Amino acid sequence: MGLQEEFEEFAEKAKTLPDTISNEDKLLLYGLYKQATVGPVTTGRPGIFNLKDRYKWDAWKAVEGKSKEEAMADYITKVKQLLEEASASTS
């Protein structure tokens, strides 16, 4: 299985993560996903009154230097970690 296919598989698995994962982890996954699928952020930072989009933009900007392949690999690693943690907490 190639990196792209594995990334797509884990993007689907990420949808099954419990709601209890931290906002920090959710934002990290968002940033890595956007970097992997779109590339570097090209839009301006949302205004102060649009906090949700501002946090998401910041998360994407934080991983700006990564290649798409690096972002995919980091995304897969993080989803695996979160799935293992979720599995351990329900055992």
UniProtKB/Swiss-Prot annotation:
Segments forming domain ACB: 3-88
InterPro entries: Acyl-CoA-binding_protein, Acyl-CoA-binding_sf, FERM/acyl-CoA-bd_prot_sf
PROSITE patterns per UniProt: ACB_2 (PS51228)
One GO-annotated biological process of the protein: fatty acid metabolic process
Source species, domain of life: Eukaryota
Tissue note: Highly expressed in leaves. Expressed at low levels in roots and seeds.
Record: residues binding an acyl-CoA: K15, Y30, G31, L32, Y33, K34, K52, K56, Y75
Induction annotation: Down-regulated by cold stress, wounding and infection with the rice blast fungus Magnaporthe oryzae.
An annotated Gene Ontology molecular function: fatty-acyl-CoA binding
UniProt entry keywords in alphabetical sequence: Cytoplasm, Lipid-binding
A cellular component term, taken from the record's GO annotations: cytosol
Subcellular location: Cytoplasm, Cytosol
PANTHER family noted in UniProt: ACYL-COA-BINDING DOMAIN-CONTAINING PROTEIN 2 (PTHR23310:SF135), ACYL-COA-BINDING PROTEIN, ACBP (PTHR23310)
Family: Belongs to the ACBP family.
Function of the protein: Binds medium- and long-chain acyl-CoA esters with high affinity. Can interact in vitro with linolenoyl-CoA. Binds palmitoyl-CoA and linoleoyl-CoA in vitro. Binds phosphatidic acid (PA) and phosphatidylcholine (PC) in vitro. May play a role in the biosynthesis of phospholipids.
Protein name in UniProt: Acyl-CoA-binding domain-containing protein 2
Organism field: Oryza sativa subsp. japonica
